[in-house]
Curated annotation (Swiss-Prot):
Induction: Up-regulated in differentiating adipocytes. Isoform 2 maximal expression level during the neural differentiation of P19 cells treated with retinoic acid (RA) is estimated to be 2.5-fold of the expression level of the untreated cells and it is detected 1-2 days after RA treatment and it decreases steeply thereafter to the basal level. Isoform 2 expression level increases steeply after 1 day of RA treatment and is estimated to be 4.2-fold of the original level at 0 hours. GO terms for biological process: DNA damage checkpoint signaling; double-strand break repair via nonhomologous end joining; inner cell mass cell proliferation; lipid biosynthetic process; mRNA splicing, via spliceosome; negative regulation of neuron differentiation; positive regulation of astrocyte differentiation; positive regulation of mRNA splicing, via spliceosome. The modification N6-acetyllysine is found at K122, K179, K244, K261. It is an enzyme of class 2 (transferase). Keywords: Acetylation, Cytoplasm, Cytoskeleton, DNA damage, DNA repair, Lipid droplet, mRNA processing, mRNA splicing, Nucleus, Repeat, Spliceosome, Transferase, Ubl conjugation pathway, WD repeat. It comes from Mus musculus (Mouse). This is Pre-mRNA-processing factor 19. Pathway: Protein modification; protein ubiquitination. WD repeats lie at residues 219-259, 262-301, 304-345, 348-387, 390-429, 433-472, 473-503. Residues 2-73 form the U-box domain. Expressed in white and brown adipose tissues, brain and to a lower extent in liver, kidney, muscle, lung and spleen (at protein level). It catalyses: S-ubiquitinyl-[E2 ubiquitin-conjugating enzyme]-L-cysteine + [acceptor protein]-L-lysine = [E2 ubiquitin-conjugating enzyme]-L-cysteine + N(6)-ubiquitinyl-[acceptor protein]-L-lysine. Its EC number is 2.3.2.27.
Length: 504
């Protein structure tokens, strides 16, 4: 029977046994270990050299002691080094075992902590949703209507509580006029010059998909239905989903900044405020919600309509919202108070509105209807000043160019029409493939490019109105498209639950 050292796993030359652990060791190894640690290496109990019990076994004849210059001396030195390595290896094995036990314990603790955090997060989210639904910043709403103003409703409709409408006061009208004057002056100064930083058409034509994100909205209720970019920082992306949520996403860090919950139905329109950390959303639940991004909370609920809200646009002042609805009305609301200032319908039409968009100057705006009409309205007078017929299906999207005199419109007739607001006529029609659906139209900030999203994404250069770019990456219908600053990138969303970016 051979004895094996518990430290080196080799047959010992001078075996001994520890009465503390009953293990066999090579005497020279265990003496070195005791000199360093004073314990038994197996159970860490106190152990001294005197306690070691030698085991009598037959030994081979030992060679004479080696001299310092002989090969046996070298072998002896190697033996000592090997002994040290064995001791170190044994210590490392013990430490590894201890570390494994500690890691296992830490993983169990981490798993338990994650479960607690998830439960608490769910409870906090539910509490916030309840608060946003039951008490949407009641303290911010002005308790009394403006005494000097009268409610302003044009056309026939269901009777309304007069206390809900404040009216277009002279101060508001003057504010709108002053802003329009400033914007018109700035546009004239710019003239027809194109910013030097704007991406050239030959560069834009080389754009390819560079990123795709599918984790913004729920996978169980797929579909991103609305898209907007922050005008002051186009790296901040706003989306609205079929999962009833509004999401703020940072393109540069690829992180979700906020997930805003409160709508009871899908979110179909979203708008970013250009200078405040506010975002706006509209839904078929007949509400418009104003959200604080830093607080991830709803600060105001605007109840301007009796039916689904179909369009949303922010006035250039940043203080007022335009909305359209299936209830055949458009409404003009104050974002600070959440009050509806005026609510108007065209009694001659009697048709639901499908979209709404402010002109860049803010004194006129356009609405689309279910019966193929595009209507231009004077905001100050609340009157319909022009109609653009020509489409043969419900209007799906309208977009004003920053140059101030182009209007692009799309409908369920697989075409995009371009209108000259100065001459009030259609000067160009982009006839698309049969059954091509258009859900989103937008000009870039310079008015140089027009993007449309629907069956796929197409980019046109204005004036020539020729297609320079075509993307088919979405596996579902494209619902939103937008340009980055100076068209440095293009963003799109679709029913495939993805947010995609295109650039060089």
């Amino acid at each position: 029977m051979s004895l094996i050292c518990s430290i080196s796993n080799e047959v010992p030359e001078h075996p001994c046994v520890s009465p503390v652990s009953n293990h066999v060791y090579e005497r020279r190894l265990i003496e070195k270990y005791i000199a360093e640690n004073g314990t038994d290496p197996i159970n860490n109990q106190p152990l001294s050299e005197e306690q070691l019990i030698d085991i009598k076994v037959a030994h081979p004849i030992r060679p004479k002691p080696p001299s310092a210059t002989s090969i046996p001396a070298i072998l002896k030195a190697l033996q000592d080094e090997w002994d040290a390595v064995m001791l170190h290896s044994f210590t490392l094995r013990q430490q590894l075992q201890t570390t494994r036990q500690e890691l296992s314990h830490a993983l169990y603790q981490h798993d338990a902590a994650c479960r607690v955090i998830a439960r608490l997060t769910k409870e906090v989210t539910a509490a916030r949703e309840a608060l946003a639904t039951l008490k949407p910043q009641a303290g911010l709403i002005v308790p009394q209507a403006v005494p000097s103003s009268q409610p302003s409703v044009v056309g026939a409709g269901e009777p309304m509580d007069l206390g809900e409408l404040v009216g277009m006061t002279p101060e508001i009208i003057q504010k709108l006029q002053d802003k329009a004057t400033v914007l018109t002056t700035e546009r004239k100064k710019r003239g027809k010059t194109v910013p030097e930083e704007l991406v050239k058409p030959e560069e834009l034509s080389k754009y390819r998909q560079v990123a795709s994100h599918v984790g913004l909205h729920s996978a169980s209720i797929p579909g991103i239905l609305a898209l907007d970019l922050c005008p002051s920082d186009t790296n901040k992306i706003l989306t609205g989903g079929a999962d009833k949520n509004v999401v703020v996403f940072d393109k540069s860090t690829e992180q979700i900044l906020a997930t805003l919950k409160g709508h009871t139905k899908k979110v179909t329109s979203v708008v970013f405020h250009p200078s405040q950390e506010l975002v706006f959303s509209a839904s078929p639940d007949a509400t418009i919600r104003i959200w604080s991004v830093p607080n991830t909370s709803c600060v105001q609920v605007v109840r301007a309509h009796e039916s689904a809200v179909t369009g949303l646009s922010l006035h250039a002042t940043g203080d007022y919202l335009l909305s359209s609805s299936d209830d055949q009305y458009w409404a003009f609301s104050d974002i600070q108070t959440g009050r509806v200032l005026t609510k108007v319908t065209d009694e001659t039409s009697g048709c639901s509105l499908t979209c709404a968009q402010f002109h860049p100057d803010g004194l006129i705006f356009g609405t689309g209807t279910m019966d193929s009409q595009i209507k231009i309205w004077d905001l100050k007078e609340r009157t319909n000043v022009a109609n653009f017929p020509g489409h043969s299906g419900p209007i799906t999207s309208i977009a004003f160019s920053e140059n101030g005199y182009y209007l692009a419109t799309a409908a369920d007739d697989s075409s995009v029409k371009l209108w000259d607001l100065r001459k009030l006529k259609n000067f160009k029609t982009l006839q698309l493939d049969n059954n091509f659906e258009v859900k989103s139209l937008i000009f870039d900030q310079s008015g140089t490019y027009l993007a449309l999203g629907g069956t796929d994404v197409q980019i046109y250069i204005c004036k020539q109105w020729t297609e320079i770019l075509h993307f088919t990456e979405h596996s579902g219908l494209t619902t939103g498209v937008a340009f980055g600053h100076h068209a440095k990138f293009i963003a799109s969303t679709g029913m495939d639950r993805s947010l995609k970016f295109y650039s060089l």
